[in-house]
Amino acid sequence: LKVIPAFHPATFIPPKFNFLNKPIIYEDLMRAKYESQFKDIKRLSRTIHTRCDFNQTINILKHCYRLGRLGQVIGIDIEVINGEVDCIGLGWSPVDSICIPFRFSGGDYFTVEEELSIMRAVAFIIQDEDIAKVGATFIFDAQFLLHKYGIRPRGSLHCTQIAQKISYPDFPAGLDAVTTMHTDIPYYKADGKQWIKMGSGTWEQWWNYNGLDAMVPVEAIPKQLEVLRKPHPPHPPPPPTPPPHPPPHPPPRRPPPPPPPPP
């Protein structure tokens, strides 16, 4: 049995008057119609590369660089713990990404020399003017990498949060809302929040969370840009200015009173 949660239609009619629920209900009903065509749960098969060794990591970063130079937008996401980059994710398609961890339960994941080489490879991608980058709340990642490592993002930089807020200004623009609207990925943001706030979950869950955060923007941004590029109907011309009213006519003069009768 497949279930799609949705707001009750009565929430956008009197007395609720929550009109913003109407387009959300419409989208959910369209999704329900699509899902009713088959019994199975069908989602895109996605791959998040975790626990890669140094050589595998460098090879994947070189692959990202080549694809980026060919026109593929590259997703970037960093996870910061106590002011340090805990892991960094890169996505190069709607179904492929890597999480590069810098620590795990045993301490540092890479040696200092390996970590330096990895960050230089990441910098080559981020600083290349011919490679388009995208991220969720990308302004945070960009300023952090600039101040912490001196990595200056160049080229086309896209942010799903900004694109979402311009496209749909009345609705949430976080990555959870973007994921729901533009992908078939189930809700996963709680995994990262629980890991950060309560330390619950496994390292694998944390790295998968980072990989999804780098992957989702790659799938979402083309759809968001399509909405932004749609021609909007022009505003109707203002009504013509009515001619000025003529000045009112002066009231007619009363005739003089008749002369008095003779005595």
Please annotate each region the language model reported.
Residues 5, 74-76, 156:
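Residue-level marker for buried hydrophobic side chains located in beta-strands
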Residues 64-91:
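Gly/Thr-rich phosphate-binding beta-strand-loop-beta motif of the actin/hexokinase/Hsp70
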Residues 31-74:
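DnaQ-like (DEDDh/DEDDy) 3′-5′ exonuclease domain used for proofreading
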Residues 235-244, 262-263:
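Extended, well-ordered alpha-helical scaffold/bundle regions in very large, multi-domain proteins
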Residues 253-254:
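Basic polycationic patches enriched in arginine
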Residues 1-44:
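Glycine/proline-rich loop-helix segments at beta-alpha junctions forming the active-site rim
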Residues 10-12, 36-52, 84, 94-229:
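Active-site-proximal helix-loop-helix substrate-binding element of RNase H-like nuclease domains
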